[in-house]
Design a protein with these regions (language model features):
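An acidic intrinsically disordered interaction segment
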Residues: 1-8, 95-103, 127-132, 136
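Hydrophobic helix-and-loop "lid/oligomerization" segment in the mid-to-C-terminal part
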Residues: 2-24, 32-62, 82-83, 164-322
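Fold-independent oxyanion-binding glycine-rich loops
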Residues: 23-24, 68, 89-92, 109-112, ...
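Short amphipathic alpha-helical face segments that pack within enzyme cores
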Residues: 29-39, 131-138
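Anion (oxyanion) recognition and catalysis
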Residues: 42, 66, 141
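Active-site cofactor/cluster-binding pocket
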Residues: 63-66, 71-122
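Short alpha-helices
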Residues: 111-179
Length: 322
């Protein structure tokens, strides 16, 4: 083992189970990196599990989880916070993308700059890297071990998602990882799992989604008044974010006792995960990545689309002013 991997292993005990925890409301990169690290640590004799906070929101991500066929723990199912030693991947409690740590924090592996100094025994934060899966791939390379096709598929799916198929925030490490993984993974399967899929019966509902919206400057919010699936929220958000002069989109399903939401950003100064997490913290829970986030809101605490969007904008401007 080389320096990074050996240092990580030096802070982990084989006498205590390891919990690999993703950022809240995980995406393909978070789960792909977690799965690949699980397989690597297992090869060294560690007992490892994966956990996440929030919800798994999109249809494509559900398909990805089913493909990996790896049990996932929800953080609220963990009662004994002393049972696990925790490695957080693709997120950090020091950035705010992880609200609750599911055990004793040992390590943070991320590709987003933290908002405060890490106190973990091991920290590997590489803000210049496009995907956390690329960092975990580098651990595999350092180990000299061979990964199987499913592990390769998990990592390349993460890179595809976070770099938008190598079209944003790409580093040489991402390219090196992608090149090798391309020939060792099921690329056709990853393409199917990354592209959000919907059912034909959803088309009419999607059409109705554009009749109730509010725009303030480059921010847009849409409310959907029927019981929409999380997949449809993702499809609508993915479409709206590419409207000219729009940089931040929120889609909220306002039906039932708990409202689902999906958010997208294409401005590097507008961190969707942070903005959603902070805005909904007193009315529900949420979070995710800089470019995409999700959440749930208690219907009785929802302040309405105008107040909600204004809260997002006020927080965004205060962050930009720092």
């Amino acid at each position: 083992m080389e320096e990074k991997l050996s240092t990580l292993c030096s802070v982990l005990s084989k006498d205590q189970p390891v919990l690999i925890q993703t950022h809240d409301f995980p995406d393909h990169d978070a789960l792909g990196a977690a799965y690949a690290l699980l397989k690597l640590l297992e090869s060294y004799g560690y007992k490892v599990e994966i956990a996440y906070g929030g919800h798994i929101q999109s249809l494509s991500l559900i398909e990805f989880v089913e493909y990996l066929d790896c049990p996932l723990l929800k953080l609220d199912e963990i009662d004994d916070l002393k049972k696990y030693q925790v490695v957080i991947v693709d997120g950090s409690p020091f950035k705010g993308t992880v609200k609750k740590v599911g055990g004793i924090l040992k390590a943070v592996i991320d590709h987003h700059p933290a908002r405060m100094q890490s106190t973990a025994a091991y920290t590997d934060i590489r803000a210049e890297i496009g995907a956390c899966s690329s960092i975990i791939w580098s651990y595999w390379k350092e180990s000299g071990k061979e990964y199987d096709e499913m592990t390769a598929t998990a990592m390349i799916a993460g890179i595809q998602l976070d770099t938008a198929f190598l079209s944003r925030s790409v580093n040489k490490l991402d390219l090196d990882a992608y090149y090798e993984l391309y020939f060792k993974s099921d690329v056709q399967k990853t393409y199917q799992m990354i592209k959000t899929t919907i059912n034909i019966c959803d088309l009419e509902e999607i059409g109705r989604a554009f009749t109730d919206y509010l725009r303030i400057d480059n921010f847009l919010i849409v409310e959907l008044s029927e019981d929409y699936s999380r997949a449809i929220l993702s499809v609508v958000a993915d479409f709206l974010i590419w409207i000219k002069d729009i940089s931040f989109v929120i889609v909220i399903e306002t039906n039932g006792p708990e409202y689902k939401l999906s958010a997208r950003s294409r401005d590097s100064k507008l961190d969707a995960g942070y903005l959603i997490q902070e805005t909904v913290k007193d009315m529900g829970s949420g979070g995710g990545h800089a470019h995409m986030a999700g959440g749930v809101i208690d219907a009785e605490r929802y302040c309405g689309k105008t107040a909600f969007l204004n809260a997002i904008i006020a927080l965004a401007r205060s962050e930009q002013g720092k």
